[in-house]
Amino acid sequence: MSRTIFCTYLQRDAEGQDFQLYPGELGKRIYNEISKDAWAQWQHKQTMLINEKKLNMMNAEHRKLLEQEMVSFLFEGKDVHIEGYTPEDKK
């Protein structure tokens, strides 16, 4: 059975995560405040960010940068800036 939460990112009730996807206190906050749809949007941006900036997840500084971008995107409403990327026009 799915959980319904108020998603901080989408600013509406939505289906919550099935389990905690990220460790620690931040993971608990994501579990309680971020919907599956919002998390999927983040994963898409995260993939683009890792590829375009050539981030190495074995590098602690790169992981910290990615975590900061995640918090900014999910909780502060800031979009991820990827140099040279222009979003498609939605018709």
Curated annotation (Swiss-Prot):
Q: Which GO terms describe its molecular function?
A: iron ion binding
The biological process GO terms on file are:
cellular response to oxidative stress
Q: GO CC terms for this protein? A: cytosol
Question: Can you name this protein?
Answer: Probable Fe(2+)-trafficking protein
Membership in a protein family: Belongs to the Fe(2+)-trafficking protein family.
- InterPro entries (UniProt xref): Fe_traffick_prot_YggX, Fe_traffick_prot_YggX_sf
Top-rank taxon, per record: Bacteria
Effect after changing residue 7 to S: Strong decrease in activity
Q: Which SUPFAM superfamilies match?
A: YggX-like
Taken from the record, one Pfam family name reads Iron_traffic
Instruction: Give the UniProt keywords, A-Z.
Output: Iron
Reported function: Could be a mediator in iron transactions between iron acquisition and iron-requiring processes, such as synthesis and/or repair of Fe-S clusters in biosynthetic enzymes. Necessary to maintain high levels of aconitase under oxidative stress.
Which NCBIfam families does the record associate with it? PRK05408.1
* Name of the encoding gene: yggX
